[in-house]
């Protein structure tokens, strides 16, 4: 999962040496397109919705919207489905990349 903001998107550039990554995230952004086109993200090892990018919504440029429109790799679901701990737990080796705006200890 990739969160909103500069830090999560900056992390994407450091994933270029990885392979067979999958995406299960509320939000899909432009930064992930390059990883898909490079074959880094192919969703082949996902244990929940294998072969599919699962997301609730997109935020980005015209390139992003054109890319996902009609693309069979994408499966858009309601946010409560994508964010359900029961569904997330079905993905083996799930990693979330987010930032915190505020932490109250």
Range-by-range predicted roles:
Residues 1-105:
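Conserved alpha/beta enzyme-core scaffold
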